[in-house]
From Swiss-Prot:
One annotated GO molecular function: ATP binding
GO cellular component: cytoplasm
Position of the signal peptide: none
Keyword RNA-binding: no
Name of the protein: Ribosome-binding ATPase YchF
Organism annotation: Buchnera aphidicola subsp. Schizaphis graminum (strain Sg)
Presence of the UniProt keyword Isomerase in the record: no
Amino acid sequence: MGFKCGIIGLPNVGKSTLFNVLTKGNSAVANFPFCTIKPNIGIVSVPDNRINNLSKIILPKKITNAFIEFVDIAGLVKGASKGEGLGNQFLSNIRDTHAIAHVVRCFKDDNVSHIYNQLQPKIDVDIINSELILADFETCEKSILKLQKKLNFNKKEIEEKLVVLSKCLDHLKKFLMLKTLELDENEKKIISYLRFLTLKPTMYIANINEQKESCFFLNELEKMAKKEGSSVIPINSNLELDLIKMNEDEQKYFMKSFNITNLGLNNIIKSGYKILNLITFFTAGIKEVRAWAIPNGSTSLQAADKIHSDFRRGFIRAQIINYLDFIKYKSETKVKEAGKYRSEGKFYQIQDGDIINFLFNV
Protein backbone atom coordinates (compact mmCIF):
# COMPACT_ATOMS: atom_id res chain seq x y z
CA MET A 1 0.00 0.00 0.00
CA GLY A 2 1.30 3.43 -0.94
CA PHE A 3 1.10 6.50 1.30
CA LYS A 4 -1.12 9.04 -0.45
CA CYS A 5 -1.09 12.82 -0.12
CA GLY A 6 -4.04 14.51 -1.84
CA ILE A 7 -3.52 17.86 -3.59
CA ILE A 8 -6.65 20.00 -3.10
CA GLY A 9 -7.72 23.62 -3.53
CA LEU A 10 -10.07 25.86 -5.48
CA PRO A 11 -10.04 25.59 -9.29
CA ASN A 12 -7.26 27.55 -11.05
CA VAL A 13 -4.90 27.83 -8.07
CA GLY A 14 -2.12 25.80 -9.72
CA LYS A 15 -2.76 22.25 -8.47
CA SER A 16 -2.03 20.56 -11.79
CA THR A 17 1.07 22.73 -12.35
CA LEU A 18 2.31 21.72 -8.91
CA PHE A 19 1.54 18.07 -9.69
CA ASN A 20 3.63 18.36 -12.86
CA VAL A 21 6.51 19.85 -10.86
CA LEU A 22 6.34 17.00 -8.33
CA THR A 23 6.12 14.24 -10.92
CA LYS A 24 8.03 15.93 -13.76
CA GLY A 25 5.03 14.92 -15.81
CA ASN A 26 2.44 16.33 -18.18
CA SER A 27 -0.84 16.51 -16.31
CA ALA A 28 -3.39 18.69 -18.12
CA VAL A 29 -3.18 22.38 -17.18
CA ALA A 30 -5.71 24.96 -18.38
CA ASN A 31 -7.29 28.28 -17.43
CA PHE A 32 -10.77 26.95 -16.62
CA PRO A 33 -12.39 25.21 -13.64
CA PHE A 34 -12.36 21.41 -13.34
CA CYS A 35 -9.50 20.91 -15.79
CA THR A 36 -8.78 17.77 -13.74
CA ILE A 37 -11.81 15.48 -13.55
CA LYS A 38 -10.35 12.09 -12.68
CA PRO A 39 -7.55 12.33 -10.10
CA ASN A 40 -4.02 11.98 -11.45
CA ILE A 41 -1.72 9.85 -9.30
CA GLY A 42 2.05 10.36 -9.29
CA ILE A 43 4.78 8.33 -7.60
CA VAL A 44 7.32 10.79 -6.17
CA SER A 45 10.82 9.89 -4.93
CA VAL A 46 11.73 11.26 -1.51
CA PRO A 47 15.09 13.11 -1.60
CA ASP A 48 17.46 11.69 1.04
CA ASN A 49 21.21 12.32 1.11
CA ARG A 50 21.70 9.23 3.27
CA ILE A 51 20.98 6.86 0.39
CA ASN A 52 23.59 8.65 -1.72
CA ASN A 53 26.16 8.44 1.09
CA LEU A 54 25.52 4.71 1.55
CA SER A 55 25.82 4.13 -2.19
CA LYS A 56 29.23 5.85 -2.33
CA ILE A 57 30.54 3.25 0.12
CA ILE A 58 28.70 0.12 -1.12
CA LEU A 59 28.74 0.92 -4.88
CA PRO A 60 25.49 -0.96 -5.65
CA LYS A 61 24.18 -1.77 -9.12
CA LYS A 62 20.89 -0.06 -8.31
CA ILE A 63 19.69 2.76 -6.04
CA THR A 64 16.00 3.09 -5.09
CA ASN A 65 14.60 5.97 -3.04
CA ALA A 66 11.57 5.77 -0.78
CA PHE A 67 8.44 7.20 -2.39
CA ILE A 68 5.06 8.66 -1.62
CA GLU A 69 2.05 9.13 -3.89
CA PHE A 70 0.62 12.56 -4.70
CA VAL A 71 -2.97 12.64 -5.97
CA ASP A 72 -4.11 15.65 -8.04
CA ILE A 73 -7.77 16.08 -7.07
CA ALA A 74 -10.10 18.36 -9.02
CA GLY A 75 -10.90 21.82 -7.67
CA LEU A 76 -13.49 22.12 -4.91
CA VAL A 77 -16.08 24.91 -4.89
CA LYS A 78 -18.73 26.30 -2.54
CA GLY A 79 -21.43 23.69 -2.12
CA ALA A 80 -19.11 20.73 -2.79
CA SER A 81 -20.47 19.01 0.33
CA LYS A 82 -23.92 19.20 -1.29
CA GLY A 83 -22.70 17.93 -4.66
CA GLU A 84 -21.85 21.24 -6.39
CA GLY A 85 -19.12 20.97 -9.05
CA LEU A 86 -19.13 17.16 -8.84
CA GLY A 87 -18.31 17.75 -5.17
CA ASN A 88 -19.33 14.34 -3.81
CA GLN A 89 -16.93 12.56 -6.16
CA PHE A 90 -14.04 14.86 -5.29
CA LEU A 91 -14.67 14.66 -1.53
CA SER A 92 -14.60 10.89 -1.87
CA ASN A 93 -11.20 11.15 -3.59
CA ILE A 94 -9.90 13.18 -0.62
CA ARG A 95 -11.25 10.60 1.82
CA ASP A 96 -9.08 7.96 0.13
CA THR A 97 -5.85 9.85 0.94
CA HIS A 98 -3.78 9.78 4.14
CA ALA A 99 -2.85 13.49 4.21
CA ILE A 100 -3.72 16.75 2.43
CA ALA A 101 -1.63 19.28 0.51
CA HIS A 102 -3.91 22.33 0.26
CA VAL A 103 -2.77 24.61 -2.58
CA VAL A 104 -3.56 28.29 -2.09
CA ARG A 105 -3.13 30.93 -4.79
CA CYS A 106 -0.89 33.72 -3.48
CA PHE A 107 -0.18 35.53 -6.75
CA LYS A 108 -1.92 38.01 -9.04
CA ASP A 109 -2.10 37.27 -12.76
CA ASP A 110 -4.61 38.87 -15.13
CA ASN A 111 -4.17 35.92 -17.50
CA VAL A 112 -5.37 33.40 -14.90
CA SER A 113 -8.96 33.86 -13.79
CA HIS A 114 -10.12 33.43 -10.20
CA ILE A 115 -13.29 31.38 -9.85
CA TYR A 116 -14.85 34.03 -7.56
CA ASN A 117 -13.19 37.04 -9.27
CA GLN A 118 -11.32 38.10 -6.13
CA LEU A 119 -7.94 37.09 -4.77
CA GLN A 120 -8.09 36.69 -0.99
CA PRO A 121 -6.18 33.57 0.11
CA LYS A 122 -7.74 33.50 3.59
CA ILE A 123 -11.25 33.44 2.10
CA ASP A 124 -10.16 30.78 -0.42
CA VAL A 125 -8.91 28.58 2.43
CA ASP A 126 -12.09 29.17 4.43
CA ILE A 127 -14.22 28.05 1.46
CA ILE A 128 -12.38 24.74 1.16
CA ASN A 129 -12.19 24.09 4.90
CA SER A 130 -15.89 24.91 5.31
CA GLU A 131 -16.79 22.27 2.73
CA LEU A 132 -14.60 19.71 4.50
CA ILE A 133 -16.24 20.57 7.83
CA LEU A 134 -19.75 20.26 6.34
CA ALA A 135 -18.87 16.91 4.76
CA ASP A 136 -17.55 15.63 8.11
CA PHE A 137 -20.64 16.95 9.91
CA GLU A 138 -22.88 14.95 7.57
CA THR A 139 -20.73 11.82 7.97
CA CYS A 140 -20.74 12.18 11.75
CA GLU A 141 -24.48 12.82 12.01
CA LYS A 142 -25.38 9.84 9.79
CA SER A 143 -23.05 7.55 11.74
CA ILE A 144 -24.62 8.56 15.06
CA LEU A 145 -28.13 7.81 13.73
CA LYS A 146 -27.03 4.39 12.43
CA LEU A 147 -25.36 3.47 15.71
CA GLN A 148 -28.36 4.56 17.79
CA LYS A 149 -30.50 2.04 15.88
CA LYS A 150 -28.04 -0.74 16.80
CA LEU A 151 -27.80 -0.01 20.53
CA ASN A 152 -29.29 -3.40 21.41
CA PHE A 153 -26.29 -5.12 19.82
CA ASN A 154 -22.73 -4.74 21.16
CA LYS A 155 -24.03 -2.04 23.51
CA LYS A 156 -20.69 -1.29 25.19
CA GLU A 157 -18.79 -0.90 21.89
CA ILE A 158 -21.52 1.24 20.31
CA GLU A 159 -21.83 3.50 23.36
CA GLU A 160 -18.07 4.02 23.26
CA LYS A 161 -18.32 5.13 19.61
CA LEU A 162 -21.30 7.38 20.32
CA VAL A 163 -19.44 9.23 23.08
CA VAL A 164 -16.54 10.07 20.74
CA LEU A 165 -18.80 10.91 17.78
CA SER A 166 -20.96 13.23 19.91
CA LYS A 167 -17.79 15.02 20.97
CA CYS A 168 -16.83 15.38 17.28
CA LEU A 169 -20.29 16.57 16.26
CA ASP A 170 -20.31 19.32 18.92
CA HIS A 171 -16.92 20.51 17.63
CA LEU A 172 -18.04 20.50 13.99
CA LYS A 173 -21.20 22.44 14.90
CA LYS A 174 -18.90 25.29 15.93
CA PHE A 175 -17.42 25.16 12.40
CA LEU A 176 -14.08 23.92 13.75
CA MET A 177 -11.89 21.29 12.12
CA LEU A 178 -11.51 18.00 13.98
CA LYS A 179 -7.71 18.31 14.00
CA THR A 180 -8.18 21.15 16.54
CA LEU A 181 -10.20 18.87 18.84
CA GLU A 182 -8.29 17.12 21.62
CA LEU A 183 -8.65 13.38 20.99
CA ASP A 184 -6.47 10.72 22.57
CA GLU A 185 -5.03 7.85 20.51
CA ASN A 186 -7.81 5.47 21.56
CA GLU A 187 -10.52 7.95 20.53
CA LYS A 188 -8.85 8.47 17.15
CA LYS A 189 -8.71 4.70 16.68
CA ILE A 190 -12.42 4.34 17.51
CA ILE A 191 -13.45 6.77 14.72
CA SER A 192 -10.68 5.96 12.21
CA TYR A 193 -13.05 3.87 10.06
CA LEU A 194 -14.95 7.06 9.11
CA ARG A 195 -11.82 8.70 7.59
CA PHE A 196 -12.85 12.22 8.60
CA LEU A 197 -11.51 14.86 6.19
CA THR A 198 -10.72 17.52 8.79
CA LEU A 199 -8.77 15.03 10.90
CA LYS A 200 -6.25 14.40 8.12
CA PRO A 201 -2.81 16.00 8.61
CA THR A 202 -2.51 19.04 6.32
CA MET A 203 0.16 21.27 4.84
CA TYR A 204 -0.63 24.45 2.93
CA ILE A 205 1.19 25.09 -0.35
CA ALA A 206 1.47 28.81 -1.09
CA ASN A 207 1.68 29.15 -4.88
CA ILE A 208 3.61 32.41 -5.32
CA ASN A 209 5.32 34.50 -7.98
CA GLU A 210 7.94 37.31 -7.92
CA GLN A 211 5.46 40.12 -7.15
CA LYS A 212 5.28 42.00 -3.81
CA GLU A 213 1.71 40.87 -3.20
CA SER A 214 2.89 37.27 -2.86
CA CYS A 215 4.85 38.15 0.32
CA PHE A 216 1.77 39.75 1.87
CA PHE A 217 -0.49 36.83 0.95
CA LEU A 218 2.12 34.35 2.23
CA ASN A 219 2.32 36.08 5.62
CA GLU A 220 -1.48 36.03 5.96
CA LEU A 221 -1.57 32.32 5.14
CA GLU A 222 1.18 31.52 7.66
CA LYS A 223 -0.72 33.30 10.46
CA MET A 224 -3.87 31.34 9.67
CA ALA A 225 -2.10 27.97 9.39
CA LYS A 226 -0.29 28.48 12.70
CA LYS A 227 -3.63 28.54 14.55
CA GLU A 228 -4.41 24.99 13.44
CA GLY A 229 -0.84 23.72 13.80
CA SER A 230 -0.21 23.29 10.06
CA SER A 231 2.88 24.23 8.04
CA VAL A 232 3.08 26.47 4.96
CA ILE A 233 5.43 25.67 2.07
CA PRO A 234 5.95 28.45 -0.53
CA ILE A 235 6.65 27.45 -4.13
CA ASN A 236 6.72 29.31 -7.44
CA SER A 237 5.18 26.46 -9.43
CA ASN A 238 5.58 28.05 -12.87
CA LEU A 239 9.25 28.88 -12.23
CA GLU A 240 10.02 25.40 -10.91
CA LEU A 241 8.18 23.80 -13.82
CA ASP A 242 10.60 25.64 -16.13
CA LEU A 243 13.54 24.56 -13.95
CA ILE A 244 12.81 20.83 -14.15
CA LYS A 245 12.82 21.06 -17.96
CA MET A 246 16.46 22.26 -17.88
CA ASN A 247 19.52 20.03 -17.79
CA GLU A 248 21.56 19.94 -14.57
CA ASP A 249 24.10 22.60 -15.63
CA GLU A 250 21.40 25.01 -16.82
CA GLN A 251 19.46 24.47 -13.61
CA LYS A 252 22.51 25.23 -11.42
CA TYR A 253 23.31 28.38 -13.42
CA PHE A 254 19.71 29.62 -13.24
CA MET A 255 19.42 28.96 -9.49
CA LYS A 256 22.73 30.72 -8.82
CA SER A 257 21.72 33.71 -10.98
CA PHE A 258 18.44 34.16 -9.09
CA ASN A 259 19.88 33.27 -5.67
CA ILE A 260 17.66 30.18 -5.31
CA THR A 261 19.23 27.95 -2.66
CA ASN A 262 16.53 25.34 -2.27
CA LEU A 263 13.65 24.12 -4.42
CA GLY A 264 10.13 24.34 -3.03
CA LEU A 265 9.60 20.98 -4.72
CA ASN A 266 11.95 19.21 -2.28
CA ASN A 267 10.44 21.01 0.71
CA ILE A 268 6.96 19.84 -0.27
CA ILE A 269 8.03 16.21 -0.67
CA LYS A 270 9.84 16.22 2.68
CA SER A 271 6.90 17.93 4.39
CA GLY A 272 4.53 15.38 2.87
CA TYR A 273 6.71 12.64 4.32
CA LYS A 274 6.66 14.38 7.69
CA ILE A 275 2.89 14.93 7.95
CA LEU A 276 2.32 11.31 6.91
CA ASN A 277 4.45 10.49 9.99
CA LEU A 278 6.82 8.27 8.02
CA ILE A 279 10.37 7.17 8.79
CA THR A 280 12.97 5.51 6.57
CA PHE A 281 14.87 2.27 6.93
CA PHE A 282 17.41 0.94 4.44
CA THR A 283 18.32 -2.40 2.92
CA ALA A 284 21.83 -2.34 1.52
CA GLY A 285 23.84 -4.70 -0.65
CA ILE A 286 25.82 -4.91 -3.88
CA LYS A 287 22.65 -5.53 -5.93
CA GLU A 288 20.68 -2.61 -4.50
CA VAL A 289 20.66 0.07 -1.84
CA ARG A 290 17.04 0.90 -1.13
CA ALA A 291 15.13 3.26 1.17
CA TRP A 292 11.77 2.10 2.52
CA ALA A 293 9.01 4.29 3.97
CA ILE A 294 7.08 2.98 6.98
CA PRO A 295 4.89 4.64 9.65
CA ASN A 296 6.75 5.85 12.71
CA GLY A 297 6.38 3.26 15.48
CA SER A 298 6.49 0.24 13.13
CA THR A 299 8.04 -3.00 14.38
CA SER A 300 10.70 -5.07 12.62
CA LEU A 301 7.97 -7.59 11.69
CA GLN A 302 5.97 -4.82 9.97
CA ALA A 303 9.12 -3.61 8.21
CA ALA A 304 9.78 -7.16 7.00
CA ASP A 305 6.23 -7.33 5.61
CA LYS A 306 6.84 -4.06 3.75
CA ILE A 307 9.51 -5.82 1.69
CA HIS A 308 7.68 -9.13 1.16
CA SER A 309 5.06 -11.20 2.97
CA ASP A 310 7.54 -14.13 3.00
CA PHE A 311 9.88 -12.04 5.14
CA ARG A 312 7.08 -11.61 7.68
CA ARG A 313 5.84 -15.23 7.61
CA GLY A 314 9.31 -16.73 8.03
CA PHE A 315 10.78 -13.99 10.23
CA ILE A 316 13.70 -15.14 12.41
CA ARG A 317 15.39 -11.88 13.41
CA ALA A 318 16.51 -8.48 12.12
CA GLN A 319 20.20 -7.58 11.99
CA ILE A 320 20.53 -3.83 12.55
CA ILE A 321 23.25 -1.28 11.81
CA ASN A 322 22.75 2.37 12.67
CA TYR A 323 23.24 4.60 9.61
CA LEU A 324 25.80 6.87 11.34
CA ASP A 325 27.79 3.84 12.52
CA PHE A 326 27.99 2.49 8.97
CA ILE A 327 29.13 5.88 7.63
CA LYS A 328 31.78 6.02 10.37
CA TYR A 329 33.17 2.47 10.00
CA LYS A 330 32.57 2.07 6.23
CA SER A 331 31.81 -1.69 6.30
CA GLU A 332 29.70 -4.33 8.04
CA THR A 333 32.84 -6.13 9.26
CA LYS A 334 34.22 -3.03 10.98
CA VAL A 335 30.81 -2.25 12.49
CA LYS A 336 30.82 -5.74 14.03
CA GLU A 337 34.38 -5.29 15.31
CA ALA A 338 33.28 -2.05 17.01
CA GLY A 339 30.42 -3.90 18.72
CA LYS A 340 27.79 -1.81 16.95
CA TYR A 341 26.04 -4.69 15.13
CA ARG A 342 22.71 -5.67 16.73
CA SER A 343 20.27 -8.54 16.46
CA GLU A 344 16.63 -7.70 17.20
CA GLY A 345 13.35 -9.63 17.46
CA LYS A 346 10.01 -9.05 15.76
CA PHE A 347 8.77 -6.49 18.32
CA TYR A 348 11.76 -4.16 17.96
CA GLN A 349 10.62 -0.63 17.03
CA ILE A 350 12.36 0.53 13.86
CA GLN A 351 14.36 3.76 14.18
CA ASP A 352 14.73 6.25 11.35
CA GLY A 353 17.92 5.41 9.45
CA ASP A 354 18.23 1.76 10.53
CA ILE A 355 20.03 -0.42 7.99
CA ILE A 356 18.40 -3.85 8.22
CA ASN A 357 19.20 -7.36 7.05
CA PHE A 358 16.23 -9.69 7.64
CA LEU A 359 16.84 -13.36 8.40
CA PHE A 360 13.83 -15.53 7.50
CA ASN A 361 12.88 -19.09 6.59
CA VAL A 362 9.80 -20.26 4.66
